[in-house]
């Protein structure tokens, strides 16, 4: 969000937008337009040939996945050159309705999603409601601070019937599409007990791959213990930034604090990856940070094994990975974590990057 942007452009005869860097030029001159067109040509050249599996220049495999929210999203994403979905936001089945979806209704949607991706991985996040996504039928009362209240898994613990139905529906979908690679994860897990509670119920429902989202400093710091209870973890960088920096991610004025380049946030990601290494469990990222080609290199250097993002960002991230070997990514990660500020972190990484990468940003 940019303060005053609406007033600044209302009388402008022309506005130029560079979506690659998030830059708006009000009343651009001929030179501005020519520069944008040249930048667009260089970006197209940098993306040329970006296809196939995600991997660094020296062959370290990194799965590149899509974030989706509906069966229609799945059908569109599945036609693209990516390796599955690292985040299916199941809450869209529950929002804006007076009663919970039935097991049959959910199973039908999950089946369509799995069928769309065939044998490719699909990671479903169980109901992530509460806070900015309230459920009218949950009957949990008003909360003074919903972001720190009963959201994510906490809501599922308060309304276990909702989770039971969802896990049953997911198991049904998995049975309907036996070749599918279904992974299921719980949001907003903060403790080992919560991870164990969810894993026991998911496995009892017949689900084979069970994980958690790391969105709180508590889960990141104790990731090695949390991961002893589950099969994988996925880092939600949006909420992890919010809770690490104590900054509401819905307030645009705090965007600088919520930057994925904040060294404190990167330290949390490093701790989570160390937990993954200690337990032999894979760590992924499904927040917006994974779709930034430059940040993606740092995440890989920290030990992240998969990146899930908006489908349209996959090609740029894949191209960025292929420009760098893993040792360079690791060096970038060390520089970023050790930086004093978010700006210093980004500048240090950019200085190590292949010059062609700038055309992808």
Residue ranges and their predicted role:
Residues 1-14:
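Conformationally flexible catalytic loops at phosphate/diphosphate-handling active centers
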Residues 13, 18, 239:
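Conserved acidic functional residues
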Residues 16-50:
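Acidic/Gly/His-enriched mid-domain segments of enzyme catalytic cores or analogous surface patches
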Residues 42-361:
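Conserved alpha/beta-domain cores
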């Amino acid at each position: 969000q940019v303060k005053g942007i609406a007033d600044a452009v209302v009388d402008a005869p022309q506005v130029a937008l560079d979506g690659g860097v998030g830059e708006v030029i009000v009343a651009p001159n001929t030179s501005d337009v020519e520069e944008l067109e040249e930048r667009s040509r260089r970006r197209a050249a940098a993306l040329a040939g970006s296809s196939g599996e995600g991997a660094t220049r020296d062959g370290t495999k990194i799965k590149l996945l899509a974030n989706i929210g509906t069966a229609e999203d799945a059908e569109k994403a599945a036609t693209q050159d990516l390796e599955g979905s690292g985040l299916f936001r199941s809450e869209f089945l529950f929002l804006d309705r007076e009663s919970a979806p039935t097991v049959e209704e959910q199973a039908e949607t999950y089946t369509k999603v799995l069928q769309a991706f065939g044998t490719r991985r699909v990671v479903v996040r169980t109901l992530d409601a509460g806070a900015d996504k309230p459920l009218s039928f949950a009957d949990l009362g008003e909360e003074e601070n919903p972001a720190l209240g009963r959201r994510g898994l906490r809501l599922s613990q308060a309304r276990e019937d909702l989770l039971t139905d969802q896990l049953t529906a997911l198991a049904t979908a998995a049975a309907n599409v036996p070749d599918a690679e279904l992974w299921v994860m719980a949001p907003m897990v903060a403790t080992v007990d919560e991870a164990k509670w969810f894993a026991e119920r998911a496995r009892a429902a017949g689900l084979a791959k069970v994980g958690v989202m790391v969105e709180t400093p508590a889960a990141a710091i104790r990731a090695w213990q949390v991961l002893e209870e589950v099969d994988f973890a996925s880092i939600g960088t949006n909420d992890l930034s919010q809770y690490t920096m104590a900054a509401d991610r819905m307030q645009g004025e705090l965007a600088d604090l919520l930057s994925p380049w904040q060294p404190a946030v990167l330290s949390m990601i490093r701790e989570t990856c160390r937990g993954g290494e200690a337990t032999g469990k894979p760590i992924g990222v499904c927040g917006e940070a994974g779709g930034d080609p430059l940040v993606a290199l740092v995440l890989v250097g920290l030990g992240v094994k998969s990146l899930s993002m908006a489908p349209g960002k996959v090609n740029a991230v894949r191209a960025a990975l292929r420009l760098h070997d893993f040792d360079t990514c690791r060096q970038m990660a060390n520089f970023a974590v050790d930086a004093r500020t978010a700006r210093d972190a980004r500048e240090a990484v950019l200085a190590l990057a292949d010059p062609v990468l700038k055309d992808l940003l």
